[in-house]
């Protein structure tokens, strides 16, 4: 690519110290390879092994750090301080997007549909949670991605074990009302929604969990998604509002459900989605003609805005 020199020297930020390190290494290597094939002068940069102050030696950064330290505003803040352009969402939007409770509060305040929830503490009366949300519920660490530490709870006696599992990953845990229905994901490129994908995990999987996302090959991805054209546009418009409400920018992903009555519910936002062979943003981009390499360059081009 003859104009790849416009990017200068690019740090592909990957790895890090979060629970999603392994996924980030896979995503980052895929992005690095794509940029190199496209003629970009790109290098891997793992903040676990190097001081972030070394980023001053780069012209821009492609963030492929998942989870804490990479998706929560921390690395974005460092890059802002160093005056280095970077891909994706800024400091505030990243911090909000990494916090499932803050995200839901903003969506609720924006009159956007998201499932009812309760924050769980040691003092929480679990019977009151069940009375309010019903069963089943899904237990989630508030500050983890990739479904790390999540469990579906169908019986009251399983509540404590699910909370214990979640607290191994985060001090803050939430219970969310289980939505029965079809799961969809909506990817964004240049701030605009791509075609909706329907997620169909195999029958033995309770939900689209870490294993289904990264380790299994029997998850079905529906493109087209099975919604009518009107419904798909409605879901895209809803998710665009949700994406913008939390301050997300550029590229990302929102997961949503359609319940048995046909209502849509927002689940969560992902401001640095996976870029592995199993990942959803590349699948959605492919549906509108982007190769993986073209997608990576398009995401990187966001860093040129305002610098030309």
Swiss-Prot record:
One Pfam family named in its UniProt record: Dala_Dala_lig_N
Function: Cell wall formation.
Class of the enzyme per the UniProt entry, highest EC level: ligase
Subcellular location: Cytoplasm
Catalytic reaction(s) noted: 2 D-alanine + ATP = D-alanyl-D-alanine + ADP + phosphate + H(+)
EC numbers on record: 6.3.2.4
Entry GO terms, CC: cytosol
Keyword terms of this UniProt record: ATP-binding, Cell shape, Cell wall biogenesis/degradation, Cytoplasm, Ligase, Magnesium, Manganese, Metal-binding, Nucleotide-binding, Peptidoglycan synthesis
Main location: cytoplasm
Name of the featured protein: D-alanine--D-alanine ligase
PANTHER family recorded: D-ALANINE--D-ALANINE LIGASE, D-ALANINE--D-ALANINE LIGASE B
HAMAP family: Dala_Dala_lig (MF_00047)
MF GO annotations: ATP binding; D-alanine-D-alanine ligase activity; metal ion binding
């Amino acid at each position: 690519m003859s104009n790849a020199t416009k990017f200068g020297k690019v740090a592909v930020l990957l790895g890090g110290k979060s629970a999603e390190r392994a996924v980030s290494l896979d995503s980052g290597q895929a992005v690095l390879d794509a940029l190199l094939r496209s003629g970009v002068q790109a290098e891997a940069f793992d903040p676990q092994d190097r001081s972030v102050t070394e980023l001053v030696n780069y012209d821009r950064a492609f963030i492929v750090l998942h989870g804490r330290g990479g998706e929560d505003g921390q690395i974005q803040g460092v890059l802002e301080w160093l005056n280095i352009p970077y891909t994706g969402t800024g400091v505030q939007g990243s911090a909000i997007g990494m916090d499932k409770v803050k995200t839901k509060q903003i969506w609720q305040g924006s009159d956007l549909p998201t499932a009812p929830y309760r924050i769980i503490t040691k003092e929480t009366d679990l019977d009151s949670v069940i009375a309010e949300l019903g069963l089943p519920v899904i237990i989630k660490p508030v500050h983890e991605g990739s479904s790390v530490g999540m469990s579906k709870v169908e019986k009251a006696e399983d509540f404590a074990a699910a909370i214990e599992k979640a607290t191994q990953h985060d001090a803050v845990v939430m219970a969310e009302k289980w939505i029965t229905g079809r799961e969809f994901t909506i990817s964004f490129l240049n701030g605009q929604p791509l075609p909706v994908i329907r997620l169909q995990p195999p029958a033995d999987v309770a939900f689209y969990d870490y294993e289904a996302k990264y380790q299994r090959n029997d998850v079905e991805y529906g493109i087209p998604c099975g919604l009518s054209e009107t419904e798909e546009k409605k879901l895209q418009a809803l998710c665009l509002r949700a994406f913008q409400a939390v301050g997300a920018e550029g590229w990302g992903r929102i997961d949503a459900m359609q319940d048995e009555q046909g209502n849509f519910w927002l689940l969560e936002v992902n401001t640095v989605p996976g870029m592995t062979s199993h990942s959803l943003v590349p699948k959605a981009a492919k549906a509108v003609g982007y190769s993986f390499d073209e997608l990576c360059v398009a995401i990187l081009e966001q860093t040129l805005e305002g610098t030309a």
